[in-house]
């Protein structure tokens, strides 16, 4: 009888352990970007488990990585919209292992509150996730302001100003909407950092003479006729000067 009971318990345990179903998921992040990943369905939530990919226009790989128990593990690879490798980030050690040189012109620019002399050394802040995919969470938080004339959607430029603390944390976001060619703000509003996950608020801080400092990241975006925005596509002619 004891052997029979033990066998029943073992079978029930195996049934519960192997009853977790792995499901392939696909989500649309923006008009142009979709993500595909595997999840384990638990009682209260979906847990990402396994290979993760994101694609631009359904065919160009933007991201390749792996989740274990909803946590990014190992080295993730991030690409631009042309499929060029932009960044390798080691999530096991929270370390940047590769960052491609930034071309010029670039839709991203950076500021620190220091006058940089010839002998000074400054480095810009870096977003884990690369210079395209890493910034999509902020673009997804964009909302069209009430009263904005739809006739001007595709004539508008949207600029995000991200304030990054010396600790490498997102401190504030200011959104500027202007008409193309004017450089004059038509609307300005803030997006609270509280809207984002802890991972989406992490940066490698800017440095000035090897000391971490506060900085600003400016992201230039274009708006289409539907009111959707994307980081402006600029063809870089050469790496920016260091």
Listing of model-derived features with the role each one plays in the protein:
Residues 23-242:
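Charge-biased low-complexity segments
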Residues 1-26, 242:
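Bacterial Sec-dependent N-terminal signal peptides
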